[in-house]
């Protein structure tokens, strides 16, 4: 019975640690406004020279929209931002009331369908955050069990297995992104959102702030963070599995 429990703990440890490594990469993307600001500085406005907003205004909008989507979800704050950038750019909606700004063309504002999609993202992220914290705690507990009840070499095996599994999966996903970014992007969104709720015109403010290059960059950040942590997991695991002299 003890052997069975230890094997079960090993499986749980590998699975929960692998999920936690992936989640850590997502946290690097979503938890820090600096990530959005860096990528917006590099890519916002790409492909839409006709946007009424300056690059700095688009970066300001991208950071504020990121807070609405994965942070405060404060609609008043996001409309305050929309008013500020329209006023700064001197658009026809510079002095528009909130309801008029909400009904403006999507080149100037975040219309109802865009805000609805951002609300959907907020709810997915909020729910995932709780679940991933629980998974991380399970990973810590299962790894502690392996270290205390089975031994350091068993823990090393868990660390290596989780890291190698994540590296293999991310290598396949990276190849998919390189071969067909649009297909990957569509498949990823279809996991969480209904068809038709996350597509917007290329000259909309939302896509102007976050063009495809922005999301490729965000994926690179996720890949780098998760990849480095996974490599560290493999290295530490290999060290733990070494026989002591």
Model-derived regions: residue spans:
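Hydrophobic secretory-pathway targeting helix
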Residues: 1-37
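Membrane-interfacial loop-to-transmembrane-helix junctions in polytopic alpha-helical membrane proteins
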Residues: 2-12, 114-127, 152-158, 209-212
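Aromatic-rich transmembrane-lumenal/periplasmic boundary elements in polytopic membrane proteins
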Residues: 22-76
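Individual transmembrane alpha-helix segments
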Residues: 73-134, 212-223
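Short, membrane-exposed interhelical loops at transmembrane-helix boundaries
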Residues: 194-216
């Amino acid at each position: 019975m003890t052997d069975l429990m230890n094997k079960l703990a090993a499986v749980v440890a590998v699975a929960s640690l692998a999920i936690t490594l992936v989640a850590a990469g997502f946290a690097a993307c979503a938890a820090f406004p600096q990530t959005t600001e860096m990528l917006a500085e590099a890519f916002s406005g790409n492909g839409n020279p006709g946007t009424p907003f300056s690059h700095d205004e688009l970066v300001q909008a991208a950071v504020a929209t990121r807070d609405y989507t994965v942070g405060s979800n404060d609609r008043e704050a996001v409309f305050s931002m929309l008013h500020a950038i329209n006023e700064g750019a001197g658009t026809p909606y510079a002095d528009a009331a909130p309801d008029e700004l909400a009904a403006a063309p999507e080149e100037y504002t975040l219309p109802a369908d865009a805000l609805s999609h951002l609300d959907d993202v907020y709810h997915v992220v909020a729910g995932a955050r709780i679940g991933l914290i629980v998974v991380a705690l399970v990973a810590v507990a299962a790894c502690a069990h392996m270290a205390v009840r089975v031994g350091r070499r068993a823990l090393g095996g868990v660390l290596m297995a989780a890291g190698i599994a994540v590296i293999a999966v991310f290598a396949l996903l990276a190849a998919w992104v390189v071969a067909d970014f649009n297909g990957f992007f569509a498949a990823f969104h279809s996991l969480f959102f209904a068809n038709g709720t996350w597509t917007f015109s290329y000259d909309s403010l939302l896509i102007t702030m976050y063009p495809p290059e922005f999301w490729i960059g965000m994926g690179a950040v996720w890949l780098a963070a998760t990849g480095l942590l996974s490599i560290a997991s493999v290295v530490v695991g290999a060290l733990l599995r070494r026989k002591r002299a």
